[in-house]
Every structure is written in structure tokens, then in C-alpha cells.
Amino acid sequence: MTTFNTISVIGAGAWGTALANACARAGRQVTLYGRSTDVLAAIAARGENPRLPGITLEKSIRVTHDLAESAKADALLLVTPTQSLREAMIALAPHVADATPLVICAKGIERGTRKFVTEIATEVLPQTRPAILSGPSFAADVARGLPTAVTLAAAEEPLAVALTHALGSSSLRPYHTTDVRGVEIGGAVKNVLAIAAGIAAGKALGASALAALTTRSFAELMRFGLACGAHRETIAGLSGLGDLILTCSSAQSRNFTFGMALGRGEAPPGSLSEGQSTAPVLIEIARAQAIEMPVAEAVANVLAGAITVNEGIEMLLARPFRAEG
């Protein structure tokens, strides 16, 4: 089996830093690339990223703002928001060697092109071997070494297996699959549905309503996934159902907290949630393929200003009675 002893994490935000810590804990030689010299200086001087306060990082992590140097690792983890992936990949392109594994750690669909994240990689970095890491995980939990399980997908099963062994440890448990599209869909779609869950929580509709909404959201996720070629077991697994449950039930999720602010009629948090960017393109795809997604469509319409939050709730509650499925 191929081993990946050196790993570079491209992106020194909370999630990138957490993954760097997990990889270092797994015994890999880790380089963490970031553009903010202040963040890198804090990590180098104090062993702590200001975006993960109170969490001590592994001393072996090396930080750098030299992208060319970072690209020399055996495997790369690309940890940037979906709408910035193309720009990051273009910057990486001159420096990445042929057949380098590129593990994308983003959840979304590119606006304008409707491309999933590995499709962007195939277009911009055709010399790499793309993979995707996704699942129910918060940066602080992973950084602290709390038990977390995720899914790692690559089209080549030997690559997926090798990466699983390279990144995995007693605290971070990756499960491998070749269903790349299924993992991409789970991560992208649940972000939009989590906004709906946050709205329900913000409107104080009750635990019963939140449970019903999450369940019906899963039905939408499954419909969309199967229509787009995902495997049923992937959508019902960690990167689908698992991630949906986590982000529909925790204020640690930016999508959930964004929805809560909408439900309360408050100004949304400053940081952009992936679901905000994904919602309109998700509905474009759903409409083009005649996939019924009333919850996701209500979210997209609220975000577009076409309807109010209350109107969206009323529309969902006024839908015709039907058989479950």
C-alpha cells in the first residue's frame, strides 16, 4: 500500500488547522500553508491558531506561506471555501507534481458552472488525483482529538484506502468509498437544509417540528442524490445523513446559526455560510432535473428575497397531504 508520510494542508483557517493537527497526531510530517502572516506567526510562536482559541497544536506542525514549497508533499489537503476553490487551484497548478493526491475538504457547488468540487479539480488540476473528505465534523472537535468519523472518497479505491490510512487515527476515523459524487452531494446539500433547520429553531417552532423538518430534509437529500448518481448507502451514511443530523442540530454550524438569525429576524452572523452560496445553484440543478425539493427551494427563495421567512413556513405547512416517501 502507498504511504503518504508528508502532507501539506492548504488553508490555515479553523478547519485546515484542525486537519493539520489530526494528521500530525497520526504521525505524519505536516506543513500548514496560510496567507495570513499574523495567523502563521501565532501558530509558530504560541502553538495556537486564533481561530481555535484554547487548543494547543502539535509541535511538529510546520507553517509556511510558500505555496510552491507546500506543494511538494506526498499528498495535499485543500481546505478553502467552495467558491474560492478555483482560484486556489489555479495558484497551485504550476507547483503540483503529476499524480499528486489532492484531498478537497470543502462542501458546496460552484456558482455559475454548477460544478462539484472534484469536477473543478479535474478541470484546473488534471495532473492530480482528486479525492474528497466530508462528514459530521466540527473543527474544534477534530483539533482537540475528540472522536470523529468522516468519509473519504476517491474514484480509485486503492487511493481511497491509502489516504484513509494516512489520515486516520484513534480519534479521526475515515471510512473510504469510491462514490465521490455521493460524498460531494451530501456535504453540499445538507448546508442548505441546515439553514431551514436553523430557521425552525430561531422561530421556536419546537422540537417536534425540527425533527420532522430534518427527516423531510433527508428525503430531499436522498432524492437529489439518487437523481444525480449517488449511491443510496452514501447518502444514508456519514457524509449524508450523519452530516445532516449534526448541522441541523448544533449552533456550532454556521449554516444553522445563520438560519437561526433569519428565524429571529436578526442580522445574520458576519461569516458567510456555504449554504448561502450553494442554495441558488442547488435549486437550478433540482429544477433542471425535475427533483422535488420544497424545503431547499423555500430556503433559496427566502435568501433571494422572493418570500419572507413566515411565507416560506406557511407554504411548507400548506403542502398537500401525501404518502410518506
From Swiss-Prot:
NCBIfam families: PRK00094.1-2 (NF000940), PRK00094.1-4 (NF000942). The gene is gpsA. The active site is at 190 (proton acceptor). This is Glycerol-3-phosphate dehydrogenase [NAD(P)+]. Disulfide bonds: none annotated. GO terms for cellular component: cytosol. Keywords: Cytoplasm, Lipid biosynthesis, Lipid metabolism, NAD, NADP, Nucleotide-binding, Oxidoreductase, Phospholipid biosynthesis, Phospholipid metabolism. InterPro entries: 6-PGluconate_DH-like_C_sf, 6PGD_dom2, G3P_DH_NAD-dep, G3P_DH_NAD-dep_C, G3P_DH_NAD-dep_N, NAD(P)-bd_dom_sf. GO terms for biological process: carbohydrate metabolic process; glycerol-3-phosphate biosynthetic process; glycerol-3-phosphate catabolic process; glycerophospholipid metabolic process; phospholipid biosynthetic process. It is found in: Cytoplasm. It comes from the Bacteria. Sn-glycerol 3-phosphate binds at residues 107, 135, 137, 190, 243, 253-255. SUPFAM superfamilies: 6-phosphogluconate dehydrogenase C-terminal domain-like, NAD(P)-binding Rossmann-fold domains. Belongs to the NAD-dependent glycerol-3-phosphate dehydrogenase family.
